[in-house]
Amino acid sequence: YWELVSDVPAGKRDTFYRFYTHSDLCALCGRLKEIYQRYDSLEDALAASSYPNPVFKLQDLFSGINGIPVMGGTSACKRLAMFLRWMVRTDGIVDFGIWQTVFHPRQLIIPLDTHVHQISLELGLTQQRTATLKTALEITEALSHIFPDDPCLGDFALFGYDINKGK
């Protein structure tokens, strides 16, 4: 990752992407380097974590890295949930399904954004008024009654629900 540091001109290191600085990217790459020095894969590192769900496992591994929500915070952890969905689910369209050994789709948490939260409130899938991880877990639990082996299957339906309203 040190090559990455030296390749970016000093005057261009303030902002790397949106809310992240060059230093943030270097910290993330540094943590990945540590993980890959200790484990054969990120999947193996997550398997070694004692936390109960995949999002907590990612938060544990990347604790202290800017852009990774802290455990117990108010974030819905949408990016982490989305990343895990891409890596675990095997729909052949959007999700890569690269990780086949550590997690099962039934363990995933729905990637929760404002739109999906509002639709979930409207449909009675949650009573939570704020989009937090607790809310995402509640919606995922509700969806698990419809899609027991893959609650995130309902994500596309919720995301697209009402999209053409008013047209």
Residue locations for each model-derived region?
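HhH-family (HhH-GPD) DNA N-glycosylase catalytic core used in base-excision repair
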Residues: 1-167
